[in-house]
Amino acid sequence: MNLFEIRQRLKELGIAQTDCKIACREFLPKLLHDHRIAITLTLKTSWYSMNGKQKVTFHLHDANIDAIWARFVHKLNKSIWKNAYRSKRDRLSTIAVLEDAHGTQRKHLHGALGHFPNDFDLRTLPGLVKRAAQECYEIDVQHREDICDRGWFEYITMHVDRRNTDNVIWG
């Protein structure tokens, strides 16, 4: 049995090959009630560190993006939840998607944030995001906050591949 015959047999049985992009577009809006705030972070392509008198230049790699997002969310959790986060009780729920644009523009992280404290004032969020982004040296100063809705999830899943969801960072 060759590959074509296997696909024909699966089609006859009603078992279609799943498309990751379609599956993400169907699944992510179900999380809409959990995630209220949409955020876009621009990543630097390179940065440097001073080691004594020696200047060391670092470049952004795709393998480091999960760690960059985790560090940013950690800093944001510390400033929003304070002691409740430090004692590991409460934290933000997050989803992020990497927008690569295949080298035509700088890499972006599009994220959705949810599970804020009940007494949290959302007007203070841009300042907290700016402070957390400044503490993460890989993130550029440019950032944007929006209201998270169904259109936002459709936009961020535009960058999900048909065969895998490697661009999605589940948090």
Residue ranges with predicted function:
Residues 89, 104-106, 169:
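Generic detector of bulky aromatic hydrophobic side chains
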Residues 93-117:
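Histidine-centered divalent-metal-coordination microenvironment in nucleic-acid enzymes
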Residues 1-38, 46-65, 115-171:
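Catalytic "initiation/cleavage/transfer" segments centered on a nucleophilic residue
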Residues 58-97:
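Surface-exposed, low-hydrophobicity interaction/linker segments
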Residues 27-29, 92-101, 143-144:
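Short amphipathic beta-strand and strand-loop transition segments with alternating hydrophobic
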